[in-house]
A protein has these predicted regions:
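Short catalytic helix/loop segments, enriched in acidic residues and glycine
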Residues: 19-34
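A C-terminal functional module that forms or caps the active site or interfaces directly
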Residues: 226-261
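A short, N-terminal amphipathic alpha-helix
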Residues: 30-49, 61-62
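A short, conserved beta-strand element in the Rossmann-like catalytic core
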Residues: 11, 122-124
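Conserved core of the sugar-phosphate nucleotidyltransferase
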Residues: 125-215, 220
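Short phosphate-binding loop-to-helix
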Residues: 67-113
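Short, small-residue-biased leader/transition segments that mark boundaries at the very start
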Residues: 1-5
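Short beta-strand-to-loop acidic/aromatic patch adjacent to the donor-nucleotide binding site
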Residues: 112-122
Length: 304
């Protein structure tokens, strides 16, 4: 059975506190509780949390300890100093090395196909089941066989500001061809529009466009690929933007696609995504989760 794991980033647009640990449910649940519940229901049997060492105690108190009673849990720590031999962390750099490095931290504890998700996104039951079913019925052959769950753009926007989304390009076999990052998408003029110049000009975009919410299914082969690509990334990044450059997971996938060494099956979810990009999003998410409980999808007390 496959592993699930989560990565923890710290949100810059959400004022104050660690937004991934913000309480959303009536009994102190956070978004992650629901994701883990859905993952376990789907068949996943292990959770790996990728966190910063300095939040370990808070993290265990808020969620880790109660999850540990339900499913096997591992912790790995993303550390800025954990880089390949021959490289030095630039003076003044405080930012870790991005989602690629985060996933690489799991190399020692992940032994089978696994799922990567954001800690602060609510993905919905269907997404976990679909990705579990794919991971347990496919393995690498002449290509790495990866997968991702995509959402309709209209199901992933907020009324409270702009969002960044990865727009998916697909081929006829529903495999990923490209992910184009659009960093400013918002609801405007009764539709959805994006801007590439900080809001000076806007372009319409189809609300049914498929977007990535960073829900990826991988075989262990990705871990070797991330490791192999890290030095080349640092070589370039440290010259161009030493304090801010990040080794992004989707960039590793894009390179493998460009070299025709991987195929990424795009699975669709019709579920509505929920997340807290802005403080004002919180009541909407709290209400959505309560109505899912009322409909019977979740018990009122998740882990009792």
């Amino acid at each position: 059975a496959s592993d699930v794991y989560k990565r923890q980033g710290i949100g810059s647009r959400f004022g104050g506190g660690i937004k991934q640990l913000e309480k959303m449910g009536p009994n102190g649940e956070i978004i992650m509780d629901y994701s883990i519940y859905d993952a376990v229901e789907a068949g996943f049997d292990k959770v790996v949390f990728i966190i910063r060492k300095d939040i370990e105690a808070d993290f265990k108190e808020i969620i880790g300890n109660r999850i540990g009673k339900q499913v096997e849990v591992d912790y790995v720590f993303q550390d800025i100093n954990d880089i390949p031999e021959g490289f030095i962390v630039p003076e003044g750099r405080t930012k870790p090395w991005g989602t690629g490095q985060a996933v690489l931290c799991c190399k020692g504890v992940v032994k089978e196909p696994f799922l990567v998700i954001n800690a602060d996104d609510y993905y919905g039951r269907h997404a976990f089941q679909t990705i579990y079913d794919y991971l347990t019925t496919h393995e690498d052959d002449d290509k790495y066989r990866y997968t991702m769950v995509a959402y309709r753009l209209k199901n992933t926007v907020t009324d409270n500001g702009h969002v960044a989304r990865g727009i998916c390009g697909l081929n006829a076999s529903n495999e990923l061809v490209s992910v184009t990052e659009r960093t400013r998408i918002e609801k405007r003029n009764n539709g959805i529009e994006y801007s590439e110049d900080d809001g000076q000009t806007w372009n319409e975009i189809d609300p049914d466009t498929l977007v990535s919410m960073n829900m990826w299914g991988f075989t262990r082969s990705i871990l070797e690929e991330i490791k192999t690509g890290f030095p080349a990334f640092l070589e370039k990044g440290l010259k161009e933007n030493p304090l801010k450059c990040e080794y992004f997971l989707p960039a590793v996938v894009s390179d493998l696609l460009a070299e025709d060494r991987a195929a990424v099956k795009v699975l669709e979810s019709e579920d509505k995504w929920h997340g807290v990009t802005y403080k004002e999003d919180k009541p909407v998410v709290v209400e959505a989760i309560q109505s899912l409980k009322d409909s019977g999808l979740y018990p009122q007390h998740l882990w009792d």
